[in-house]
Each structure stands twice: as C-alpha cells, then as structure tokens.
Design a protein with these regions (language model features):
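Short, well-formed alpha-helical segments that are part of the catalytic scaffolds
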Residues: 1-7
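Conserved donor nucleotide-binding strand/loop of the catalytic core
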Residues: 10-13, 24-52
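A conserved acidic beta->alpha catalytic loop
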Residues: 16-24, 65
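Acidic donor-diphosphate engagement hotspot in glycosyltransferases and nucleotidyltransferases
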Residues: 23, 70-72, 160
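Acceptor/aglycone-binding surface of glycosyltransferases and processive sugar-polymer synthases
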Residues: 37-40, 44-51, 69-150, 154, ...
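Short aromatic/hydrophobic "clamp" motif used to bind/position activated sugar donors
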Residues: 58
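Catalytic metal- and UDP-sugar-binding loop of GT-A-like glycosyltransferases, i.e.
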Residues: 61-63
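Catalytic donor-sugar/metal-binding loop of nucleotide-sugar-dependent glycosyltransferases
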Residues: 150-152, 161-179
Length: 214
C-alpha cells in the first residue's frame, strides 16, 4: 500500500497496533510515519491516524492493498466541491474476484446506506456503501465532527457520514475499485455471523444518531 500511494501524497501515516510482525519497521523503511500504540479497534485506529496526520486533506485507506492510488485522483477532484468524498465498493464491475464483497455483503451495505438516505432525506444524501474505508476529507471538515466520532469499531465509517450530514456538510460518493486482500482479515466481516453482528451494531448507531441519543 505504501509503495502504491507514496508518489501521490505528501505524507503517509500508518497506525500500528503494536504488532509483532515487523509492520512498523517495514513501514518506516518505506518512508511512512508510524503511529504505534494499542488501539481499541478499527475506528480508534482511523481517528488516531487522522489526528497524527499534518495535511489539509486526510485520505483514509486500509493497509492490506484493498484499494489503489489510481482512484485517488477522482476523489480529490470531487473534493474541490465537497467536504468529504467517500468510495463505494458496490459496483460489481469494479470488484476484483476474491475481494471481500460477496453479493450478500454488498447488498447489505446498500440496504443500510439507503436507510441513512431515508432518515436524513432533507440533506439529500446519495449512498450505496456504509463500510468503505477509502475516503478523503478536508481537515477543517474533520475538525467540525471529530468530537462527535465516538465509535471504535466498524460503525466509525457510517458515523463519519452521518456526522457530516448533521453539520450540513456536503458528502459525495464515488465508485472505487475493490481488490482482494493481500494479507490479513477484516475481523468485522470475517464470517457471515460477524458481518450480521456488525450490521446490527451499525443499525443501532444509526438509530441513536437519528433520535439524537448520541
């Protein structure tokens, strides 16, 4: 991932959960800034990474080569007219064989995304994916919502979307290529049972946000 992105960005921050597989050492050798500490989960790692980054534009990706820099240009182009641009992995023709976006998972993301559309209809959102990490956001926009980002798990991604809508930010969704993971497993969707449990937790977050309970 670092090799793929380093020619396209000014800085790469890797959040490393004190892993013992040499991730931090390799990342530093490739020129990344490594932020090592025990994280409480996926959302906490992303949040700490954004806090550690210094740029005016923050780009989030996973470290397992699921996404490529070839899609970064269009995210940044659309960001000129938005507060945040998020990717969607639901375009079938852009999903590599073996990628973790089986039909049931893809349609589950679509269904939950449409629920957010319905509940925040006045903001005119157009979403088809609530779980795509690949996104770009202006630092100023992130600062507006960071105090409301409380989730440490996979619900962090839809929470970002919802909080941008709540501050009347403009969010644009674009299709991005989704590739097979080169290593590791995303624990929140490692099996159908875990995906369903993650989905229910995300639904709970959405409803609490809509009812202003969090």
């Amino acid at each position: 991932m670092i090799r793929n992105f380093r020619e396209h960005v000014d800085e790469i921050v890797v959040t490393d959960d004190c892993s013992g597989d040499g991730t931090a050492t390799l990342a530093r050798e490739l020129g990344a800034t490594v932020h090592s500490r025990p994280f409480r989960g996926y959302g906490d790692a992303l949040r700490q990474g954004m806090e550690a980054a210094s740029g005016d534009i923050l780009v989030l990706v996973e470290a397992d080569a699921t996404f490529r820099a070839k899609d970064l240009g269009k995210l940044l182009e659309y960001l000129k007219d938005a507060d945040m641009v998020i990717g969607t992995r639901t375009t079938r023709q852009m999903i590599e064989q073996g990628a973790n976006m089986e039909g049931w998972l893809r349609w589950g993301n679509v269904a939950v995304a449409k629920l957010i559309e319905a509940l925040w209809w006045g903001s005119e959102p157009r979403f088809t994916d609530v779980g795509c990490t690949y996104r770009a956001i202006w630092r100023d926009a992130y600062v507006k919502i960071r105090d409301y980002l409380t989730r440490d798990d996979a619900a962090f991604s839809p929470e970002m979307m919802i909080e941008m809508l709540r501050v009347e930010g403009r969010v644009i969704e674009l299709p991005v290529r989704s590739y097979r993971r080169r290593r590791g497993v995303f624990k929140y969707s490692a099996s159908r049972c875990k995906s369903l449990w993650t989905g229910f937790r995300i639904l709970g977050v959405i409803l609490r946000k809509r009812l202003n309970l969090s």
